[in-house]
């Protein structure tokens, strides 16, 4: 089993959701602020006379759990849906999971997903 976590631009949330909803049993999307290694966005002030560099970028984090056999399909779908070709597209991390328990059904392992 794998835990896939993708930090993406917030405007790509719908595209990623559409891309993975048929591939996974469920997923979680969290919104927040992040700071990657890339350049920060420059923001103009209200009157347009000044600007400042944002300390953080708005990001969305998509988390899902899948069988090992499905991991590459899900990773590919997320990468394709979130790609803009510019810096700041995000990052996808994959972790191995030792076990899982569905609290409601009491199913364990891959059946819990």
Residue ranges and their predicted role:
Residues 1-113:
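Positively charged, small/polar-rich N-terminal and surface patches that mediate targeting and assembly
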């Amino acid at each position: 089993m794998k835990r896939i976590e993708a930090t993406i631009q917030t405007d790509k949330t719908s595209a990623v959701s559409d891309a993975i909803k048929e591939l996974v049993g469920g997923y979680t999307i969290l919104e927040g602020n992040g700071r990657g290694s890339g350049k920060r966005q420059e923001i103009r002030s209200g009157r347009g006379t000044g600007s400042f560099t944002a300390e953080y970028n708005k990001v969305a984090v998509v988390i899902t759990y899948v069988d090992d056999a499905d991991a590459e399909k899900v990773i590919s779908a997320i990468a394709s849906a979130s790609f803009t070709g510019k810096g700041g597209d995000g990052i996808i991390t994959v972790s191995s999971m030792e076990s899982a328990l569905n609290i409601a059904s009491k199913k364990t392992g891959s059946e819990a997903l």
